[in-house]
Curated annotation (Swiss-Prot):
Encoding gene, per UniProt annotation: ugpC
GO cellular component, one term: ATP-binding cassette (ABC) transporter complex, substrate-binding subunit-containing
Protein name: sn-glycerol-3-phosphate import ATP-binding protein UgpC
Topology class, membrane: Peripheral membrane protein
UniProt similarity note: Belongs to the ABC transporter superfamily. sn-glycerol-3-phosphate importer (TC 3.A.1.1.3) family.
Length: 348
């Protein structure tokens, strides 16, 4: 069992730069929680604080109700996987796996038992006698994960472990990490700037921006109900399309039934209906700026009233650049926000 609690965490450097500001977060036992956000949002710093590699300016850290602020990293029972594999090049895979256990004076029989178990889980049994230079990038990352698995810690921390891998291998490793974490049941925090990784791996996602939490929720909650314009823009590929409420009302010729504070609307690229359906939603007559083929469909950048929209079409277009394209956004597919606060609003 490992429940992580962060209470009023603040991290400010001596030069005055505030990295994390009054952050509160609880990670449930056996949960895989993913921290996602742009570079500089504080996600990796938060991970390093939990690991004990950075000290907090103020706030409290607990694991299973035990305060760990002043504990040394080695005494926190936490294992961390980094972006760089950090394997010892002169040692075999087996040597890398057993190194930490030997330092802790773990009995030899127990070491062999743990290595056998980890190697089987990670499918690296054939590579135990090889050196890291004889392995592919994906195999090296499995060995790096094996080193933390054999320790059997209370908590796993992953700091962008897949960012050095190509797209196809990254997708494969995401599935393997998710399967592995479920099998072991170890409470885990995973940091990434890649929203696709976050959506694939997470039980819950924490979206961070400028040292603060924008939203916490399941992948589908974050995607379907973004609480801020930042989340709406950051999560989703392509991201949401935004337009001014007054501009849309002028286009439609009537007012829309949103709360008074709503002055910004947004819609996902995939919700559109190709063609004109005025009884179902808002019809847009646009001009094609760019067509990006994606398998059997395409993403289309269109120009409308000084706005550039990206829409997703699940068929191949015969249109060309500069041609007209009409589509409809169903009424229920619009999200409503307030520009000043950046927060989601509710319909009347």
């Amino acid at each position: 069992m490992a429940i992580i609690q962060l209470s009023n965490i603040k991290k400010q450097y001596e030069n005055g730069i505030l990295v994390i500001d009054d952050l509160n977060l609880t990670v449930a036992d056996k949960e895989l929680l993913v921290l996602v956000g742009p570079s500089g949002c504080g996600k990796s710093t938060l991970l390093r604080i939990i690991a004990g590699l950075e000290q907090v300016t103020s706030g409290e850290l607990y694991i299973d109700n035990e305060r760990i602020n002043n504990r040394e990293p080695a005494d926190r029972d936490i294992a961390m996987v980094f972006q760089n594999y950090a394997l010892y090049p002169h040692m075999t895979v087996r040597g890398n796996l057993e190194y930490g256990l030997k330092n802790r004076k773990t009995p030899k029989d127990e070491i062999n038992k743990r290595i056998t178990h980890a190697a089987k889980l990670l499918q690296i049994e054939p590579f135990l006698d090889r050196k890291p230079r004889q392995l592919s990038g994906g195999q090296r990352q499995r060995v790096a994960m094996g080193r933390v698995i054999v320790r059997q810690p209370r908590v796993f921390l992953f700091d962008e472990p897949l960012s050095n891998l190509d797209t196809q291998l990254r997708a494969q490793m995401c599935i393997e990490i998710k399967t592995l974490q479920r099998s072991l049941g170890t409470t885990s925090l995973y940091v990434t700037h890649d929203q696709l990784e976050a959506m694939t791996l997470a039980d819950r996602i924490v979206v961070m921006n400028k040292g603060a939490i924008e939203q916490i929720g399941t992948p589908m909650e974050i995607y379907d109900y973004p609480e801020t314009t930042f989340v709406a823009d950051f999560i989703g590929s392509p991201s949401m399309n935004f337009l001014d409420r007054k501009t849309l009302e002028q286009h439609l010729g009537h007012s829309l039934s949103y709360s008074q504070e709503t002055d910004l609307l947004a819609f996902r690229p995939e919700v559109i209906l190709l063609g004109e359906y005025p009884n179902q939603g808002a019809v847009f007559h646009t001009q094609i700026e760019l067509i990006k083929p994606v398998g059997t469909g395409c993403h289309v950048l269109t120009h409308w009233n000084n706005n550039i929209f990206t829409i997703e079409i699940k068929e191949r277009l015969t249109h060309d650049y500069g041609q007209k394209l009409s589509f409809t956004v169903p009424h229920q597919s619009f999200h409503s926000f307030n520009k000043s606060t950046g927060k989601r609003t509710r319909e009347n």
